[in-house]
Design a protein with these regions (language model features):
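Surface-exposed loop/linker segments characteristic of extracytoplasmic
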Residues: 1-138
């Protein structure tokens, strides 16, 4: 972990107070500075799912695992139901280089490479489109 956790660095208790105090600019600047300095804003990738918030426990298959081309980072605003960290648009992330472990509905765990073909990865993320995917595709 680098420096402080994302929660500690970007926690804002009340959006109204934030606007009134003028700290909104400071909060956005802190987020921008951290992002530009390559501080890993999602520096707790492998444990966020355990927090149980919707945006922490779900992910989509639009962006490949551990994407560096399209990183889905967020800054906290303290608004439990409206900030980016409560969004359901998160990509899968792992501390494993080159991919991530996935738990499948049949109970098996498989390592999915970050270089997986996007059509295959998107098909793995569907429930009822009827795709048949052989294991050699991922």
């Amino acid at each position: 972990m680098l420096g402080v956790t994302a929660a500690a660095a970007y926690d804002v208790p009340d959006a109204t107070a934030l606007l009134a105090s003028g700290n909104l600019v400071q909060a956005l600047q802190a987020c921008t500075t951290a992002y530009k300095s390559n501080m890993n804003l999602v520096n707790d990738n492998s444990v966020r799912w355990a927090w149980g918030a919707v945006g922490m426990a779900l992910f989509q298959t639009i962006v490949p695992p551990n994407s560096t081309q399209y990183p889905w980072n967020d800054c906290r605003t303290g608004c439990a139901q409206c900030s980016p960290d409560d969004s359901s648009y998160s990509n899968s992330q792992s501390n494993h280089p080159g991919g991530a472990n996935f738990l499948f509905a049949d109970g098996s765990v498989k390592f999915i490479k970050s270089t997986i073909a996007m059509q295959t990865y998107m098909a793995l993320g569907t429930k009822a489109n009827g795709e048949v995917i052989s294991a050699d595709q991922y």
